[in-house]
Swiss-Prot record:
It comes from the Eukaryota. Contains 4 disulfide bonds. Belongs to the conotoxin O2 superfamily. The cysteine framework is XV (C-C-CC-C-C-C-C). The keyword Cell cycle does not apply. It is found in: Secreted. Residues 24-49 form a propeptide. Keywords: Disulfide bond, Pyrrolidone carboxylic acid, Secreted, Signal, Toxin. This is Conotoxin Ec15a. The modification Pyrrolidone carboxylic acid is found at residue 50.
Length: 86
């Protein structure tokens, strides 16, 4: 599985270099290629993002699944916690 991940990463970087190299004869900046490769590798290593479903406890909007927000149970003091809601 690791070899497949590395192979996909290398293919992605090579494809990016080829596509950028064809535009007006310019070569891509080395830093851009390295930064793109690092971001892609990090995303592959992390796997799919896990999100908090509706009505589950949360601390921040970033935890909630798409279309949901982390909101208080009771608005005045928010002592009882928050859940992901529409």
């Amino acid at each position: 599985m690791e070899k497949l991940t590395i192979l996909i990463l290398v293919a992605t970087v090579l494809l990016a270099i080829q596509v950028l190299g064809q535009g007006e004869g310019e070569k891509p900046p080395k830093e851009w290629v390295q930064q793109y490769a690092a971001k892609r590798l990090w995303a592959l290593m992390k796997g799919p993002r896990q999100c908090t479903p509706k009505d589950a406890p949360c601390d921040d909007n970033n935890q909630c699944c798409s279309g949901l927000e982390c909101k208080c149970f009771n608005m005045p003091d928010c002592q009882s916690g928050s859940t992901c809601r529409v």
